[in-house]
Regions:
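Walker A (P-loop) phosphate-binding loop of P-loop NTPases
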Residues: 13
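Pre-Walker A (Motif I) flank of P-loop NTPase domains
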Residues: 2-5
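Hydrophobic anchor at the beta1->P-loop junction of P-loop NTPases
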Residues: 8
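A glycine- and Lys/Arg-enriched "phosphate-lid" helix/loop adjacent to the NTP-binding pocket
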Residues: 100-169
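NTP-dependent small-molecule kinase module
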Residues: 22-24, 140-214
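Hydrophobic positions on the alpha1 helix immediately C-terminal to the Walker A/P-loop
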Residues: 19
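Conserved lysine of the Walker
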Residues: 16
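ATP-dependent small-molecule kinase phosphotransfer cores
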Residues: 32-124, 197
Length: 214
């Protein structure tokens, strides 16, 4: 079993951070090193970009500006966190990566995918995840989950439902276009059931043990 670079993607309210933590804990029970990280974030620069992009002040940030800020944070994150972790044989579990840019700024805001891909290629140096886990949830359910905790609501959560539907559709299109590199999980189920489905999906593609302690 080779430690891999696995990214959790999906629309808002899918439970990415919860399921990432569950998977990390499960992998650690079999003795592997696991690095948990997120985008934007993972580095001092990334956390500063995260605060800027997700803050609730009334300053309008253009979609093109979002792309460039995210790319800058991603370039730092890849080289400072992800590549070194991979080099020492650790699992890297990341909450969002390049596909979120394609879904949010591409699908949601309508920016050209070809341009986005060129920027991401430069930012990542061509680094590609071994697998993506798409935690899919209908927009109405996902946003209701997010707004149930007012303290956690961010700028993206306040975008229109139509915007979030475009984002979800873009994620589903990305997964359908490359099914060997995606595990699509119905995230409307309970936390334990979703965790089991995530593990089964990874086991099918990354030769994980079929059964392990949860």
């Amino acid at each position: 079993m080779n430690p891999s670079f696995v990214v959790f993607e999906g629309p808002e309210g899918g439970g990415k951070s919860t399921q990432l933590a569950r998977l990390a804990a499960r992998l650690r029970t079999i003795g592997d090193e696991v690095v948990e990280t997120r985008e934007p974030g993972g580095t001092r620069l990334g956390n500063a970009v995260r605060a800027l992009l997700l803050g609730l002040d009334d300053y309008a940030i253009l979609p093109e500006t979002e792309v460039l800020l995210l790319a800058a944070a991603r370039a730092q994150h890849v080289r400072e966190v992800i590549v070194p972790a991979r080099a020492r044989g650790a699992w890297v579990l990341c909450d969002r990566f390049v596909d979120s840019t394609y879904a949010y700024q591409g699908g949601g805001h309508g920016l050209q995918i070809e341009q986005l891909r060129a920027i991401q290629e430069y930012a990542t140096g061509g680094l590609d995840p071994d697998l993506r886990v798409l935690l899919d949830v209908p927009v109405e359910i996902g946003l209701a989950r997010r707004h149930a905790d007012p303290a956690s609501v961010n700028r993206i959560d306040l975008a229109s439902a139509d915007f979030h539907r475009r984002v979800r559709g873009a994620f589903l299109d990305l997964a359908a276009a490359d099914p060997a590199r995606w595990v699509v999980v119905d995230a409307t189920a309970g936390v334990d059931e979703v965790a089991g489905l995530v593990w089964e999906g990874l086991a099918d593609r990354l030769t994980l043990p079929a059964r392990s302690h949860r």
